[in-house]
């Protein structure tokens, strides 16, 4: 084995051994969104920036029965969208600011109004959350 091959192999061993403790490894670990609970106890996930977050959200999407997506009409995803979800009685049961283009939440089956605001441009949709499966709501600006 030549000296160059030994150096290259040694470098690879060092890089591979650092994988779990490197800044890159820590950045990947923290990029996966975690479940949050509101004061009313409604669980939700928000994120979807980057492939790691999208993969993580897709992996657990079946656990959530309302999926909301925020995007520009040109196709670019949006984050930092103010979201409020009201039940049929008009009570706000979830209010948050999205951390990415996707917001997944777990609600009791029923009819809901989803109100959103991105940079002062508000929209609203009504949806029916099913007993089984999930509802999808899309907002485009």
Tell me what each language-model feature is:
Residues 24-81, 121-141:
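Primarily secretory-pathway and cell-envelope proteins
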Residues 100-106:
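Short, surface-exposed beta-strand/beta-hairpin micro-motifs centered on an aromatic residue
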Residues 1-10:
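Bacterial N-terminal signal peptides that target proteins for export
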Residues 82-93:
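Short amphipathic beta-strand segments in non-cytosolic proteins
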Residues 16-24:
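C-terminal segment of classical bacterial N-terminal signal peptides
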Residues 108-109, 131:
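Surface-exposed loops/turns
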Residues 93-98, 129:
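Short beta-strand segments within Ig-like beta-sandwich modules, predominantly Fibronectin type-III
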Residues 110-116:
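A short tyrosine-centered beta-strand micro-motif
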């Amino acid at each position: 084995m030549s000296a160059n091959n030994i150096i290259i192999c040694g470098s690879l061993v060092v890089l591979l051994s650092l994988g779990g403790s490197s800044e890159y490894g820590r950045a990947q670990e923290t990029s996966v969104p975690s479940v949050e609970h509101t004061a009313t106890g409604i669980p939700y996930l928000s994120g979807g920036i980057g492939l790691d977050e999208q993969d993580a959200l897709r992996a657990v999407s079946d656990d959530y029965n309302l999926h909301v997506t925020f995007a520009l009409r040109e196709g670019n995803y949006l984050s930092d969208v103010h979201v409020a979800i009201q039940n049929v009685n008009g009570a706000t049961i979830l209010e948050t600011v999205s951390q990415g283009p996707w917001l997944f939440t777990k609600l009791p089956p029923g009819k809901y109004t989803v109100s959103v605001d991105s940079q002062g441009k508000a929209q609203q949709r009504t949806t029916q959350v099913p007993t089984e499966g999930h509802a999808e709501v899309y907002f485009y600006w």
